[in-house]
Amino acid sequence: MALYEHIFLARQDISAQQVDALVEQYKGVIESFGGKVGRVENWGLKSLTYRIKKNRKAHYALMDIDAPAAAVHEVERQMRINEDVLRYMTIAVEAHEEGPSAMMQKRDRDDRPRRDGDRPDRGPREDRGPRPPREGGFGDREDRPRRPREDRA
């Protein structure tokens, strides 16, 4: 039997329990063909990059499958028929990853780069004094001459 990773996206307006029911339904199909489902991860409701069938969000689910190709074809056929499934993708893999997938791993806050917008080698702006005025440009709005209003007909 071959090893697969199977990911599917379900519509945003179904509940998490209905997503779990879909996973159990497809798990039953795979087991009826003599396959096994290892890890099952529900990634939850996430925003889509672009709209799919008028949906902006979707429930993501991942299944690690050890089954014959006929089982995978049957699961994909049933997903094509089901209106609650927006997209699916099955990938053949050499071995299943141990532990949680990359989507489920939490990054440590200390590992993330700083996002305060200032370079770490400089102090706060107050330590460096005020910025000099720009040359040739107008600083604040009060310094600019008023623009004449155009009458629109």
From Swiss-Prot:
It comes from the Bacteria. It comes from Agrobacterium fabrum (strain C58 / ATCC 33970). One of its GO terms (cellular component) is cytosolic small ribosomal subunit. InterPro entries: Ribosomal_bS6 (IPR000529), Ribosomal_bS6_sf (IPR035980), Ribosomal_S6_plastid/chlpt (IPR020814), Transl_elong_EF1B/ribsomal_bS6 (IPR014717). The gene is rpsF. Keywords: Ribonucleoprotein, Ribosomal protein, RNA-binding, rRNA-binding. The lineage of its organism: Bacteria, Pseudomonadati, Pseudomonadota, Alphaproteobacteria, Hyphomicrobiales. Residues 94-153 are annotated as: Disordered. This is Small ribosomal subunit protein bS6. It holds the Pfam family Ribosomal_S6.
